[in-house]
A protein has these predicted regions:
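Short amphipathic alpha-helix segments
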Residues: 4-30, 93-101
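N-terminal interaction modules that seed assembly of large macromolecular complexes
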Residues: 19-60
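Charge-rich, low-aromatic oligomerization/scaffolding segments with amphipathic character
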Residues: 49-67, 125-141, 195-205
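Accessory beta->alpha helical hairpin/"wing" motif in late/C-terminal subdomains of nucleic-acid enzymes
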Residues: 114-121, 180-199
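Short glycine-/aliphatic-rich beta-strand segments at the starts of folded cytosolic domains
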Residues: 1-13, 77-87
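Short amphipathic alpha-helical interface segments
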Residues: 101-108, 123-162
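Short amphipathic alpha-helical interaction segments
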Residues: 90-102, 157-174
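A short, conserved structural fragment
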Residues: 29-31, 107-111, 172-182
């Protein structure tokens, strides 16, 4: 197979460098990279063991980057979950659907769809929301509580800038959370209703 090259131009030299860092992380020395300011050249050498496969992976990375970083059609970015997780500094593993919930509470549109976080929040805002949720979720791990209670408390604490224990007490006080037979805190209503009611109460407090 002959050498394949792709030339790209980014909005800034910093954005170009960030993209090359991603390419290096994902593809290593299977891609030869050159940067000149905001311009980038990517080369798949013909000596590659799987040049066609590497070229396809590179095109996929470029597509994911563009969907996530460029001005969106209809006001919605499509952030690749893979790209998002590679950029986030997580305290603990998190359910990504909770990040969508947090963005919604912050006033953004957000949903998970086929490997993408579709939202009108830009990439940096999505990364920040994931990190905020992860930090609060880590604090809930000491609670004697069911997983959904921890998730709910972390989402609300991150959305409204409240301590986790304060949020838990508010949930208990409103009857949305109760103590189960085994002593663990459990939801008294379904998760969606609890999130809606609690966000209304905490948002107006």
């Amino acid at each position: 197979m002959r050498k394949r090259a792709i030339a790209l131009r980014f909005g800034s030299s910093q954005e170009a460098a960030e993209f090359l860092s991603l390419v290096s992380e994902r593809m290593g020395d299977r891609v030869i990279v050159e940067q000149s300011g905001s311009s980038v050249k990517l080369v798949i050498p013909p000596s590659s063991d799987d040049a066609r496969g590497d070229y396809a992976k590179l095109l996929s990375l470029i597509r994911q980057w563009r969907l996530s970083r460029q001005s969106p059609r209809g006001g919605v970015f499509k952030h690749s979950i893979t790209l998002l997780l590679s950029a986030v500094k997580l305290r603990v593993g998190i359910p990504l659907s909770a990040v969508a919930e947090l963005l919604q509470l912050k006033g953004f549109r957000a949903k998970l769809e086929e490997g993408f976080l579709e939202t009108n929040a830009d990439f940096e805002s999505a990364v920040r929301a994931a990190e905020e949720f992860s930090e609060k979720y880590a604090e809930t791990l000491d609670l004697e509580a069911a997983p959904l209670v921890r998730r709910l408390a972390a989402v609300l604490a991150a959305a409204y800038g409240r301590p986790v224990d304060e949020v838990v007490e508010a949930l208990r006080g409103t009857g949305l959370v109760r103590e189960g037979e085994d002593g663990k805190l459990v939801l008294a209503v379904n998760y969606a209703d609890a999130l809606k009611k609690a966000s209304s109460l905490l948002g107006s407090a």
